[in-house]
Amino acid sequence: MEFENKSGLITLIILIMASAVTLISQSIVTTSLPYYMDDFAISSATAQWTYSVFLLVLGVMIPPTAYITKRFKIKTILITSLILFIIGSLICFLSTNFEMLIVGRIMEAMGTGILMPIGQILIFRIMPEEKWGFFMGLMGFLVGIVPAMGPTIGGIIIDLFNWRVIFEFLAIITVVILVLSILLANFELETQNYPLDFPSLILSIIFCVGLMIGFSNIAEFGFSFIHVILPIIIGILTLIIFVKRQNKIENPLVNLIVLKNKYFVYGTVFAALLYFMMCGINVMVPLFVQNVAYYSPTESGLILFPAAIIMIVFNFISPIMADKIGVKPVLIVSSIMNIIGFACMMTYNMNSTFEYLLATQLIRGIGCGLGLSPAITWAMSVVADDVEDATAVNNTTRQVVGAIGSSVTVVIMQILANGNITHNQLSVNSFSMTSLMMIIITVVLLIITILFIKNKNDIVDD
């Protein structure tokens, strides 16, 4: 690929490498959940917080990225985020209780949340338009596909060593990338003295935390007003106040003008709902395979690995397909493949063979790979002039919805299984009903695509 801005390309490559490592940490803990339950004497609903809190903090960190990228140099942001991630990984490695593990996961997510959107912004600022699809496909691989490889890597490490080595592995690789960043990441975008609206930052934290805590607590507290209903209400009310404030003040934390573009909204909703399902699957499938079907952590990870590989392949080619035949037919095929995959998951039982579990996850992997990157690229391309704010809105929405997805999935499975996901028919039925929920969501995506998604030429002529 011929590209004049070599410094920008090198910086982007380092950002992609850093994002890949940090995003793997998002889901690499899912095969460790049974071990956290044993070592720290906690429930499955509590253990999944190691996954959900990561997504929650990502959602919290993304809104201020529009401000951060306008205010600070890219190299400063990159180095700071990597140092935060390394410290978090070391805390997890040394954790002596579950609370310490959660603190480490929060710091890992803080580093990832600062880092993740910068690459997307760089693509639209330094790349020619004809390269947007390719590089956004690569970033889509990081946002939605790399986390799918986490369970496989985590399962292998656990079987060979123990769950703590996962965090040692992450820290060592990140140190190498930190050295490369210090030596080679020299490209900078123009910065400005953009003020931080602190009240907006606080509001964004409150609404993310409120929604996440409310949904996550359902498994342990039912529909308790204090533990569930109240946090959700606070989250929703705070979100409303946040939106009103952004539309009123002169220097908003996130400029919500991008939401006036209906096509950006459609694409963001599609990507968020698809990500909801992907995050839910990253939790529900390992729980079923290990606790219900009695496979090992490595086997659990290997069942998801081919799906991750096929998602990588289709994630790269799907933006190219969308450029050639239009985004609408690509997203329709994506939804149909996901419906077939989830329908197959409804047939799982305690004696399902390794080959059948693997093959059906492969079908679903094709559907997810076809959908995520084209939806994100399409949404961002229609508001390219406001890419910093569009990135913040798109990523925040996707991460918060993804965090809710992982929590709601476990909650539904656990409630339907009477609080104990184990080797019995009730747990099989709970998995089937959760898969049915995924089918319903996918049908909604199909309807959105048919009714509202348009190819770019049609938008211009609209």
Question: Model-predicted segments: where are they?
Answer:
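Flexible interhelical linker loops that connect adjacent transmembrane helices
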Residues: 1-3, 130, 178-208, 247-262, ...
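12-transmembrane solute porter fold
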Residues: 8-24, 29-33, 42-54, 66, ...
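Membrane-embedded alpha-helical segments in integral membrane proteins
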Residues: 26, 30-34, 87-92, 144-159, ...
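Hydrophobic/small/kink-forming positions within alpha-helical transmembrane segments
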Residues: 56-60, 90, 144-148, 152, ...
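Helix-loop-helix hairpins in multi-pass membrane proteins, especially solute transporters
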Residues: 62, 66-199, 410
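Membrane-interface helix caps and helix-loop-helix hairpins in membrane proteins
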Residues: 98, 189-194, 218-224, 351
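C-terminal membrane-cytosol helix-exit motif in multi-pass small-molecule transporters
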Residues: 171-190, 205-217, 233-248, 445-453
